[in-house]
């Protein structure tokens, strides 16, 4: 299924595709195949809650990311198994990616609270300029097939920390890891 607006749902067309284990050719899952209508629905959902999400405090966003970091570690074997099945990466390498990917969540959980901006002198030296950090709005995040968790965390974590909503489009070859990560973020 597709995660749109915090809810799992089938693709609007009802179409599906198979995810295959590259080592055996066996189908390991059948997933909903999103089309342009689903993409628009996902963007509309992200836009609809952007202002509300941007008003969450940096501490709230940091706590979500920290909890996600903890959950990824708790679910490390499940993540590694999914990656190995859907992309053929050796299990030990998949475990390494889980550890690596989780670190983005931890790092951005700490950075989220450093959202205070800064004062800088203007060139004339008589005034000071204030630089504030603000969410830029919904982000489109596209991930490659070869690092399905690490690249998802690398893109999702800064968006969450900054107060941006997002649409994540995983690679069609490795969507299971992204789905499991999306559920993990919901659980956080």
PLM regions and their residue ranges:
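Glycine-rich loop-to-alpha-helix module at the N-terminal edge of alpha/beta enzyme cores
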Residues: 26-116, 126
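Alpha-helix N-cap/helix-start motif
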Residues: 12, 39, 76, 94, ...
């Amino acid at each position: 299924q597709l995660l749109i607006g915090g809810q799992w749902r089938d693709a609007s067309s009802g179409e599906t595709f198979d995810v295959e284990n590259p080592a055996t050719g066996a189908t390991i899952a059948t997933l909903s195949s999103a089309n342009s209508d689903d993409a628009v629905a996902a963007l509309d959902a992200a836009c609809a809650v952007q202002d509300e999400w941007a008003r969450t405090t940096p501490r709230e966003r940091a706590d979500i990311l920290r909890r996600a970091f903890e959950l990824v570690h708790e679910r490390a074997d499940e993540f590694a198994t999914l990656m190995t099945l859907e992309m053929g990466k050796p299990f030990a390498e998949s475990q390494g990616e889980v550890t690596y990917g989780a670190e983005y969540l931890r790092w951005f959980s700490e950075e989220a609270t450093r959202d205070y901006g800064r004062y800088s002198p203007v060139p004339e030296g008589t005034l000071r300029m204030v630089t504030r950090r603000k969410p830029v709005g919904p982000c489109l995040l596209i991930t490659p097939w070869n690092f399905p968790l690490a690249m998802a965390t690398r893109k999702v974590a800064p968006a969450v920390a900054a107060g941006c909503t997002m649409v994540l489009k995983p690679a069609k070859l490795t969507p299971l890891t992204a789905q499991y990560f999306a559920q993990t973020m919901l659980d956080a």
